[in-house]
């Protein structure tokens, strides 16, 4: 599911909701699916162009969070910092709209950085 929710003959279309799948690198097994629950088949979220964040890059490069935007103007944080997969969560960190209320699509990956170790 995502931006292209078109269907081919004999296949079902996506639901248009933004999702991130965390996979086992060796086996390809799904460790966890994180679903924004935003979007629909007729108005897909188009979540794409994700950026991974690690404040511990000099130690072990463990990803602590993933950020991404969607075509509905939302910026998301997929927090992977918890010790168990059940503690991982999603937070909407911004919703970009015009003064008239129209969504401003996010079409590039977020640029991430640390400001004074915060």
Report residues per predicted region.
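A fold-level detector for beta-propeller and closely related beta-sheet-rich head/sensor domains
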Residues: 1-118
């Amino acid at each position: 599911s995502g931006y292209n929710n078109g269907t081919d003959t004999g296949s079902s279309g996506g639901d248009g909701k933004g999702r991130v799948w965390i996979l086992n690198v060796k086996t390809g097994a799904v460790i966890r699916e994180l679903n924004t629950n935003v979007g629909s088949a007729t108005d897909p979220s188009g979540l794409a162009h994700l950026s991974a964040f690690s404040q511990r890059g000099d130690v072990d490069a463990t990803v602590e969070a993933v950020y991404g935007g969607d075509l509905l103007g939302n910026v998301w944080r997929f927090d992977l910092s918890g010790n168990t997969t059940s503690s991982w969560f999603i937070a909407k960190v911004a919703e970009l709209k015009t003064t008239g209320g129209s969504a401003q699509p996010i079409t590039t990956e977020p640029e991430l950085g640390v400001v004074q170790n915060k």
